[in-house]
Amino acid sequence: MVVSRGKTPNAQETFLQMAQASGLRGRILITVGLLILCRLGIFIPVPGIDRVAFSNDLQGNANLGGVIGFLDIFSGGGLSALGVFALGILPYINASIILQLLTAAVPALEDLQKNEGEAGRRKIAQLTRYVSLGWALLQSIVIAVWVTRYAVTPGPLFTIQTALALVAGSMFVMWISELITERGIGNGASLLIFLNIVATLPRSLQQTLELAQSGDRSTVGGIVILLIVFLATIVGIVFVQEGTRRIPVVSARRQVGNRVYSERSSYLPLRLNQGGVMPIIFASAILVLPFSLANFTSNEVVLRIANYLSPNGPTPWIYALFYLVLIVAFSYFYSSLILNPVDLAQNLKKMGSSIPGVRPGRATSQYVQGVLNRLTILGAVFLGLVAIIPTAVEGATRIRTFQGFGATSLLILVGVAIDTAKQVQTYVISQRYEGMVKD
């Protein structure tokens, strides 16, 4: 995307224009209403489960609590409450990741996405729904079999009705997510995760306050250090999300009829973090997989692997290293999905634009690829460090009250907030230009 140089509205102007845009107000109301509806569904329980026994088991098993705590990021507490929305948006996110991987590997899907336009995107969206349904069905069966030990009347009927309730809840959440994306503001799936993370924040703050009131000076000092690190993490996330490298682009002089258009300069913005929050979500999902398998299978080998990959285990440096490698790998993957230097070079050539000092065509694609590689490795390593440092500080200070609201949650929160704010600004600008055209 080539951007011309011009004035960008500041935050105050955008807020005033947002307040005056009736269409935007309607979209915001739709978004808020659907988010509230989805949040209320968290408290609808799956029938036939002894919640007292489940709650006692959850509190007595640290590993189980850690797994449930991470998965609750995507369900907003639905899994720990065993509600019908227990799966949350996770099947849809997993399906989206699978389709993105297949699009990069299967030529037919790649052609569908690149060359079929809106019709191709609709087909991929439909495929994503089918994969979401299959993934939700698989997860719901596993959970239904697992919670049989807490059933009031265990048996095949309980397993079937529990699985169906979980699948129905997951599909309803997916539908709400797509409604928000189409008729609201922002990305529906991201906003649902955002809401679920925010829902866990009051509990973490309450536990931290109680710990500060009952603890000694070292405990209070540890809490202060942890909060400072969290604030620094937010600053680092904003830097990674907003950091861009502007490559100058020059459009050649051209003549249309009797008019001669002079050469104009613009720039090509390359983000420091092309993948946004997806690399961190995917890396976290991979890391939690051994814990899920360990709790569902009770296999000794899987338990040992999960223990070594735990940030609270005997070898936290293995967790940190593995987490960093996964973030870097997925950052490269998403960078290649979002921006193709060969296609970019061809588009610049068709528009009669070029990068100063670089020949059009293959040389341009190689130049952009080199810049993109350097940006990606820098952004990915910085993103990995931002994700690891708060966890390391938690281990050093032994303050675990933010266990469910760690660096991963902060990365997702700030990233989604920035992306949504940009979409609001884009909508306001487009409304302003539409008004100018009508006038």
Swiss-Prot record:
Membrane-spanning parts: 28-48, 73-93, 127-147, 156-176, 179-199, 220-240, 276-296, 318-338, 375-395, 401-421
Topology within the bilayer: Multi-pass membrane protein
UniProt keywords, alphabetically: Cell inner membrane, Cell membrane, Membrane, Protein transport, Thylakoid, Translocation, Transmembrane, Transmembrane helix, Transport
Taxonomic superkingdom: Bacteria
GO CC, alphabetical: plasma membrane-derived thylakoid membrane
Any GO BP annotation: intracellular protein transmembrane transport
InterPro entries: SecY (IPR026593), SecY/SEC61-alpha (IPR002208), SecY_CS (IPR030659), SecY_dom_sf (IPR023201)
Localization: Cell inner membrane; Cellular thylakoid membrane
Record note on quaternary structure: Component of the Sec protein translocase complex. Heterotrimer consisting of SecY, SecE and SecG subunits. The heterotrimers can form oligomers, although 1 heterotrimer is thought to be able to translocate proteins. Interacts with the ribosome. Interacts with SecDF, and other proteins may be involved. Interacts with SecA.
Purpose of the protein: The central subunit of the protein translocation channel SecYEG. Consists of two halves formed by TMs 1-5 and 6-10. These two domains form a lateral gate at the front which open onto the bilayer between TMs 2 and 7, and are clamped together by SecE at the back. The channel is closed by both a pore ring composed of hydrophobic SecY resides and a short helix (helix 2A) on the extracellular side of the membrane which forms a plug. The plug probably moves laterally to allow the channel to open. The ring and the pore may move independently.
Family the UniProt entry places it in: Belongs to the SecY/SEC61-alpha family.
This protein's name: Protein translocase subunit SecY
Species, as recorded: Synechococcus elongatus (strain ATCC 33912 / PCC 7942 / FACHB-805)
Taxonomic lineage of the native organism: Bacteria, Bacillati, Cyanobacteriota, Cyanophyceae, Synechococcales
